[in-house]
Amino acid sequence: MASQILDRDLHIRAIDAFIDPSVPRERAIITHGHADHARSGHGAVLATPDTIAIMKVRYGEDCAGRFEPLDFGVPLQIDDVTITFFPAGHVLGSAQVLVEQGGQRVVVTGDYKRLPDRTSQPYELVECDLLVTEATFGLPVFQHPHPSIEI
Protein backbone atom coordinates (compact mmCIF):
# COMPACT_ATOMS: atom_id res chain seq x y z
CA MET A 1 0.00 0.00 0.00
CA ALA A 2 1.45 3.34 -1.10
CA SER A 3 0.53 5.23 2.08
CA GLN A 4 2.90 3.04 4.09
CA ILE A 5 5.80 4.91 2.50
CA LEU A 6 4.84 8.12 4.32
CA ASP A 7 4.04 8.81 7.95
CA ARG A 8 2.25 11.82 9.30
CA ASP A 9 4.09 15.11 8.64
CA LEU A 10 5.30 13.81 5.26
CA HIS A 11 7.94 11.66 6.93
CA ILE A 12 9.56 9.03 4.71
CA ARG A 13 10.15 6.37 7.32
CA ALA A 14 12.67 4.20 5.53
CA ILE A 15 15.18 7.04 5.13
CA ASP A 16 14.08 9.26 8.04
CA ALA A 17 13.52 12.27 5.79
CA PHE A 18 10.77 14.88 5.97
CA ILE A 19 9.27 16.73 3.01
CA ASP A 20 8.89 20.48 3.69
CA PRO A 21 9.16 20.12 7.47
CA SER A 22 8.03 23.07 9.58
CA VAL A 23 10.73 22.46 12.21
CA PRO A 24 14.44 21.69 11.73
CA ARG A 25 15.11 18.04 10.85
CA GLU A 26 18.27 16.05 10.25
CA ARG A 27 17.19 15.32 6.65
CA ALA A 28 14.75 17.58 4.77
CA ILE A 29 13.46 17.41 1.22
CA ILE A 30 12.32 20.87 0.12
CA THR A 31 9.78 21.35 -2.70
CA HIS A 32 10.47 25.05 -3.34
CA GLY A 33 11.98 28.20 -1.89
CA HIS A 34 8.91 29.92 -0.41
CA ALA A 35 9.05 30.47 3.35
CA ASP A 36 6.08 28.20 4.10
CA HIS A 37 8.04 25.26 2.61
CA ALA A 38 11.74 26.11 2.94
CA ARG A 39 13.10 26.85 6.38
CA SER A 40 16.58 27.09 7.85
CA GLY A 41 18.24 24.88 10.44
CA HIS A 42 18.06 21.44 8.79
CA GLY A 43 21.01 19.07 8.98
CA ALA A 44 20.82 18.22 5.28
CA VAL A 45 18.63 19.66 2.53
CA LEU A 46 17.78 17.79 -0.65
CA ALA A 47 16.31 20.18 -3.24
CA THR A 48 16.69 21.39 -6.79
CA PRO A 49 19.71 23.64 -7.43
CA ASP A 50 17.40 26.65 -7.97
CA THR A 51 15.60 26.04 -4.68
CA ILE A 52 18.92 25.74 -2.86
CA ALA A 53 20.05 29.05 -4.40
CA ILE A 54 16.83 30.74 -3.24
CA MET A 55 17.25 29.33 0.28
CA LYS A 56 20.84 30.60 0.50
CA VAL A 57 19.80 34.11 -0.58
CA ARG A 58 16.85 34.13 1.80
CA TYR A 59 18.45 32.53 4.88
CA GLY A 60 22.22 32.74 4.31
CA GLU A 61 24.86 30.41 2.90
CA ASP A 62 25.02 28.36 6.10
CA CYS A 63 21.26 27.94 6.63
CA ALA A 64 21.63 24.13 6.57
CA GLY A 65 24.35 21.72 7.61
CA ARG A 66 24.77 20.65 4.00
CA PHE A 67 22.97 20.89 0.68
CA GLU A 68 22.35 18.02 -1.72
CA PRO A 69 21.25 19.38 -5.12
CA LEU A 70 19.16 17.05 -7.29
CA ASP A 71 18.20 17.93 -10.86
CA PHE A 72 14.78 17.20 -12.32
CA GLY A 73 14.36 13.66 -13.64
CA VAL A 74 17.50 12.27 -11.98
CA PRO A 75 16.68 9.39 -9.62
CA LEU A 76 18.49 9.31 -6.28
CA GLN A 77 18.69 5.92 -4.55
CA ILE A 78 18.85 6.01 -0.74
CA ASP A 79 18.73 2.50 0.70
CA ASP A 80 15.57 0.95 -0.82
CA VAL A 81 13.91 4.31 -1.57
CA THR A 82 14.23 6.24 -4.82
CA ILE A 83 13.62 10.00 -4.88
CA THR A 84 13.08 11.83 -8.18
CA PHE A 85 12.11 15.48 -8.68
CA PHE A 86 9.74 16.63 -11.41
CA PRO A 87 8.83 20.25 -12.20
CA ALA A 88 5.82 21.62 -10.31
CA GLY A 89 5.46 24.79 -12.42
CA HIS A 90 4.90 26.99 -9.35
CA VAL A 91 8.12 29.03 -9.07
CA LEU A 92 11.70 28.68 -10.25
CA GLY A 93 13.00 25.30 -9.04
CA SER A 94 9.70 24.08 -7.60
CA ALA A 95 9.48 20.31 -7.54
CA GLN A 96 7.07 17.46 -7.13
CA VAL A 97 8.75 14.67 -5.16
CA LEU A 98 8.31 11.14 -6.47
CA VAL A 99 9.06 8.61 -3.73
CA GLU A 100 9.35 5.00 -4.87
CA GLN A 101 9.66 2.01 -2.60
CA GLY A 102 8.65 -1.63 -2.97
CA GLY A 103 6.99 -1.04 -6.34
CA GLN A 104 4.81 1.78 -5.00
CA ARG A 105 4.93 5.37 -6.28
CA VAL A 106 3.93 8.33 -4.11
CA VAL A 107 4.07 11.91 -5.42
CA VAL A 108 4.18 14.75 -2.90
CA THR A 109 3.79 18.24 -4.25
CA GLY A 110 3.71 21.54 -2.48
CA ASP A 111 2.24 24.32 -4.58
CA TYR A 112 1.98 23.64 -8.29
CA LYS A 113 0.69 25.31 -11.42
CA ARG A 114 -0.39 23.34 -14.48
CA LEU A 115 -0.34 26.21 -16.97
CA PRO A 116 3.15 27.10 -18.24
CA ASP A 117 4.70 30.53 -17.85
CA ARG A 118 8.18 31.99 -18.15
CA THR A 119 8.99 32.08 -14.42
CA SER A 120 9.40 28.37 -13.79
CA GLN A 121 10.00 25.03 -15.41
CA PRO A 122 6.68 23.72 -16.81
CA TYR A 123 4.62 21.31 -14.72
CA GLU A 124 4.99 17.62 -15.59
CA LEU A 125 2.30 15.06 -14.89
CA VAL A 126 3.78 12.17 -12.88
CA GLU A 127 2.13 8.76 -12.77
CA CYS A 128 1.66 7.54 -9.20
CA ASP A 129 -0.32 5.32 -6.85
CA LEU A 130 -0.90 8.11 -4.33
CA LEU A 131 -0.82 11.90 -4.74
CA VAL A 132 -0.34 14.13 -1.70
CA THR A 133 -0.89 17.77 -2.60
CA GLU A 134 -1.19 21.12 -0.95
CA ALA A 135 -4.67 22.62 -1.01
CA THR A 136 -4.24 26.21 0.16
CA PHE A 137 -7.00 27.38 -2.17
CA GLY A 138 -8.78 24.04 -2.59
CA LEU A 139 -12.12 25.06 -1.13
CA PRO A 140 -14.92 25.96 -3.57
CA VAL A 141 -15.15 29.43 -1.98
CA PHE A 142 -11.91 30.34 -3.81
CA GLN A 143 -12.59 31.28 -7.42
CA HIS A 144 -9.61 32.45 -9.43
CA PRO A 145 -9.93 34.23 -12.77
CA HIS A 146 -8.44 32.68 -15.87
CA PRO A 147 -4.69 33.48 -15.97
CA SER A 148 -5.05 35.37 -19.25
CA ILE A 149 -7.15 38.05 -17.53
CA GLU A 150 -5.60 37.85 -14.06
CA ILE A 151 -2.27 39.49 -14.89
For the regions a protein language model found, what residue spans apply to each?
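His/Asp/Glu-rich metal-coordinating catalytic cores
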Residues: 2-12, 18-23, 27, 33-151
